[in-house]
């Protein structure tokens, strides 16, 4: 009896295996035919026009914002560049990027590694990769973005290239709704004092950088409704590098968001040195109940993508819960003291 059962199971398995293999083959052929039947799309980007056929499935991203945007669009790249900190991949992206191949640094990606991955789309930036764009294009269709701090543009461009425009539009729709809601809450809390002025300060080992409205973080704060107190901030590029503490007055604002570039002791010491300067003590933010907020360097500066930008909104919502009134009151007191 047992022998008969074994023979039956063996016959059943022998009959099932070809069927399973045939089903897998048919599924692969259907996907391939579906991709082939789609019309080629002409993607206009910073370095020209690239033809993309079907839906790319093997993506290599060569800058941080592109990696972030791919994950937001529901794509797991086959290759990514190393993160600037929290190496090799930012912590907030690790769950989505387990097992992904590293293709080198953003400043110097490995063409050999990229070629071995056999991608069907490469996403690059003009700032980092213009000189190797021709070589990248020989490996696979390549699109290049000019302004990598424009995270919404990155989502839109990648949505088109990846044949996920609907998903990109959905992401941006929810972003707009969230920003509108946050702006309304801040307006209601601050009243006539809104909008408040802001400075984004990043401390490094030997200098301070202040990020302007054209920067990644600056564009997010500007969209919410924050302003910069100095008109020239809107035309001075992405950031200003300050090496002399005599320039402290140029960063004056109602609120400071402070980033430390790394956890090196020299960075923390440099921050303490700037704080100890008499000119720092005269600034509005330190005077107003210490309206100086430490924030995550990855989310606010290095992520460069829509997911990182949403993490910024998380920070702002947490940090301003129940604190706006104290800012307003302190600023009123400062004005009264100035007029006496």
Where are these regions (language model features)?
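Boundary at the C-terminal end of the N-terminal hydrophobic targeting segment
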Residues: 34-38
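Basic- and aromatic-lined ligand-binding clefts that recognize polyanionic substrates
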Residues: 58-62, 66-70, 170-231
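A short, structured surface patch at a secondary-structure boundary
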Residues: 66-113
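Proline-aspartate-enriched helix->loop->beta-strand connector
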Residues: 111-113, 118-123, 141, 252-256
